[in-house]
Design a protein with these regions (language model features):
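C-terminal cap/substrate-recognition subdomain and adjoining C-terminal extension
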Residues: 7-141
Length: 141
């Protein structure tokens, strides 16, 4: 889910991260801007909220009464807020948010992804708990 224009994620990954681009071909990338910009011009928060809700609605066989983990990775508080708003659609939801640095360099993004990828098992091991992780810059960076 991106607030970028349709195709932006695919184009950027092809240019900067060709190996990642191949993986992304197997994942549905949704442009919140593409879905919602006409209805909510300039309201990027609403784009993300409505796109998250639309993605949830597209899962027809989901049981909203069983314990559910909502996991959000993003570099903006907007994703964190939109994922929090999804909790209201479940009777028993646990939210796990991983907020990356805003506007990271390529090197910083690679470090963030490597760190989180090594911790995914422990993040998911706490399936019955909420969790919030915020990646920040060191003071001297």
């Amino acid at each position: 889910m991106t607030n970028g224009s349709p195709g932006w994620v695919e184009l950027s990954s092809t240019k900067f991260y060709p190996k990642t681009s191949k993986i992304l071909q197997k994942i549905k990338v949704i442009s919140a801007r593409g879905l919602c910009e006409k209805k909510y011009p300039g309201d990027i928060r609403q784009w993300k909220n409505m796109a998250f809700k639309s993605a949830l609605d597209s899962i027809h066989d989901i049981n909203r009464n069983i314990p559910t983990n909502i996991i959000c990775f993003g570099d903006s508080i907007i994703e964190m807020e939109a994922s929090y708003n999804l909790k209201e659609y479940f009777s028993n939801a646990y939210l796990k948010t991983i907020k990356f640095k805003e506007s990271p360099t390529h090197t910083e993004l690679e470090k963030e992804l490597k760190i989180i990828s090594t911790q995914l098992d422990s993040i998911m091991a706490n399936s019955d708990k909420n969790l919030s992780i915020k990646v920040t810059r060191k003071k001297n960076e």
